[in-house]
Amino acid sequence: HAMVYSRLSRRLRETGHASFHDYLGWLQNHDGPEWQEFVNALTTNLTSFFREHHHFEILAKYLKTRSVTGGWRIWCNAASTGEEPYSIAMTVMESLQARTASQLVASDIDSKVLASAEKGVYRLESLKNVGEERLQRFFLRGTGANEGMVRVKPELRQAVQFVNVN
């Protein structure tokens, strides 16, 4: 309850509404970008690269031992800022080694986190679960003002299609 109150209180201040009742009434009578801001305010975005590492081991084994006609189609729901879909894409690319086509769609209801995911820029420290071999294969390290940052390489970025669903 406190989390919802806190998050929506910010929306009230930014939109100039005096109460939750006024704000929700206004939302019900207006289509437009504030609906997406409302959704974004209520989402929680907890993610990391190779979170629940054993899941990726199971996925790799599954991909290597199964054949599929027409290629793999994978959906990553609640993609957040992209760490999990990129982890899935790395696992797929390593496991299939271009033997089978794949399509990975990553969706979320929060447009702001998806914009971040599409950029594919992360703090190097957030890749603690990504080994050095993967880091070199799939990421570009920042230099100068961007030192301590990484960007996904085009090969990895192109393996994921990000979609806002809501």
Identify the role of each PLM range.
Residues 98-166:
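Extended basic-aromatic, gly/pro-enriched interface segments that bind polyanionic ligands
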Residues 17, 97-98:
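Helix N-cap/coil-helix junction residues
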Residues 69-87, 101-105:
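Conserved class I S-adenosyl-L-methionine
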Residues 1-75:
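Conserved AdoMet
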Residues 58-63, 85-95, 118:
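Short, well-ordered amphipathic alpha-helices
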Residues 10, 94, 111:
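Active-site micro-motifs of SAM-dependent methyltransferase domains
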